[in-house]
Amino acid sequence: MKKLSRKIRMLTQLFLLRLASQVLPGPTGKYLARRFITPQAAERSKAASALNASSGVRTETLTLAGINITTYQWGDPSREPYVLLAHGWSSYALRFAEWIPMLRSMGYAVVGFDQPAHGASSGKTNHLPLFVEMIQQVGRHFGKPAVFIGHSMGASAVVFAQDEEWCPERFVLIAPFVAISENATRQFETAGISPKAFTSFEAYLYSVTGRRFAEYEGALRLPLMKGPALIIHDRNDRETPWEKGARFAKLWPGARLFTTEGLGHNRLLDHPSVINEVMNFIKPETINGQVD
């Protein structure tokens, strides 16, 4: 009965949003923009539980841009080649917890961090420009990583985070998107929201971030990317269609696409086939020999 009541409530809310986007597109767009930059709070409790279940991890708080960022370290990134982990939207660093023993056994130190408004870090909102800035600042704090592993928005953001001063040697990017504008438009279309609300939606985001969607068009940056890259995407990804990942891989010079079936957007992070593919791609002898 609870599930039925919840479903009826969600359908009613969706109907009202669709109607409001037609009648009051300005306020509706602004409301949707606020939701767009607010991660799901429920994931914070999952992050806390994951930390309680973790062993051998060292936590540290960095204050970056006035935000307290929680970092997680295994090994010594100042002495060992390290892997930098970047989680996706409404997720947390310890989502990669199952990967840590294998990464450590290969001789890597590992660094993860919770984005603002995610996991144990402070803040209430986040957005792609801030994702990019945090990857840059955390990366520069710990130095050049031997490997960058990112999921979803964490994977897409690194395209704009790396520059001449800071660039990982090798990339593993799971379920990335090419353009944030495409994701936003797709969400509008899937929910049946009137396009008339999109103008105020983007205007509100600009007032918060000072950036336009057009500034984060991956198709312009991807052809300039350097370093071996493994792109992983599932054909049944409902959040970011497989075609986006395939295009991402095609635009990145020399990138390799690994496709999974039936794992969706999130479950592929836990699947042995994905983890094994990544470990083979980043094993030290592969990197030292630059074998793709």
Each language-model region and where it sits:
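Short beta-strand/loop motif that positions the catalytic acidic residue
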Residues: 224-226, 231-233, 237
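An N-terminal hydrophobic leader/cap segment in hydrolases
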Residues: 3-61
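Alpha/beta-hydrolase active-site loop
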Residues: 125-146
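Gly/Ala-rich beta-loop-alpha elbow adjacent to hydrolase catalytic centers
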Residues: 149-158
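Short alpha-helix in the alpha/beta-hydrolase fold that links the catalytic acid
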Residues: 99, 218, 227, 241-250
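Catalytic histidine-centered segment of alpha/beta-hydrolase-like enzymes
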Residues: 263-273
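Hydrolase active-site cap/lid region
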Residues: 163-211
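Conserved alpha/beta-hydrolase
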Residues: 93, 100-122
